[in-house]
From Swiss-Prot:
Binding site for (S)-2,3,4,5-tetrahydrodipicolinate: H159, G168, T169
Its biological purpose: Catalyzes the conversion of 4-hydroxy-tetrahydrodipicolinate (HTPA) to tetrahydrodipicolinate.
Binding locations of NADP(+): R38
Keyword Mitochondrion annotated: no
GO MF entry, a single one: NADP binding
Any one GO biological process: lysine biosynthetic process via diaminopimelate
Signal peptide interval: none
Recorded name of the encoding gene: dapB
Protein EC: 1.17.1.8
Protein name from the UniProt record: 4-hydroxy-tetrahydrodipicolinate reductase
Catalytically driven reaction(s): (S)-2,3,4,5-tetrahydrodipicolinate + NAD(+) + H2O = (2S,4S)-4-hydroxy-2,3,4,5-tetrahydrodipicolinate + NADH + H(+); (S)-2,3,4,5-tetrahydrodipicolinate + NADP(+) + H2O = (2S,4S)-4-hydroxy-2,3,4,5-tetrahydrodipicolinate + NADPH + H(+)
Cellular location(s): Cytoplasm
Amino acid sequence: MSGQVRVAIVGAGGRMGRTLIEAAYNHDHILLGAAIERAGSSLVGVDAGELAGVGKLKVMIMDSLDYATDDFDVLIDFTAPDASIVHLDWCVRHKKAMVIGTTGFNHAQKEQINAFAEQTPVVMAPNMSVGVNLMWKLLELAAEVMGDYTDIEIIEGHHRHKKDAPSGTALKMGEVIAKTLGRDLEKCAVYGREGITGERDRETIGFATIRAGDLVGEHTAMFADIGERLEITHKASSRMTFANGAMRAAHWLVEQKPGLYDMQQVLGLH
């Protein structure tokens, strides 16, 4: 699409929300139409641009999407699973597209998202950076070549405030590898080890999680054999990489038919 796409950002007052506002401001083809915070927030009525440090945008923080129905085309949501489901329901009822960067959905919630996406265009991705989405393609290749004879471990680290573990990105890494090898991640995943665990089963995929300080996001997949190992690593140094990906997804999504899409499709990697 060559024209501007109007976006609304929910959770505008959080760390990611403020970064999304800044990314929208800096994008040539995105216009910030609305910024939403929870009811009762002290930020309601504050200029979204001043909140994000980019100057006045004349878009005031509101406490309900109902006040912004005519102000945007695509909703961008990096909040929490329960809230994202509520927001997606609203988007379906008001014929709005939605970009979901939230992680930590349970199986039932994923089924709800699939059903809602039959009625409105949705991009959902655990990680919207270009580098991570390229990494998933590299993981497919590594799994094809080395997966059958190596021990596979996934290590991820995030800041102390992240609430879900392992991260959605780490789980997606495991899913990509397991699918390539014809395995079921739910059956072969091992989440942390403690005590006398016995020898490692080569059919498993191990996960280790770090939560510390202000780590933005670090992910490594290790394919370890006797005498050598391959490590594929992505490190994010700023949330802006995820925010820019979300803007790219919103700009792409506005012309799509109802359906559930991912960043691989947005980036043309499928």
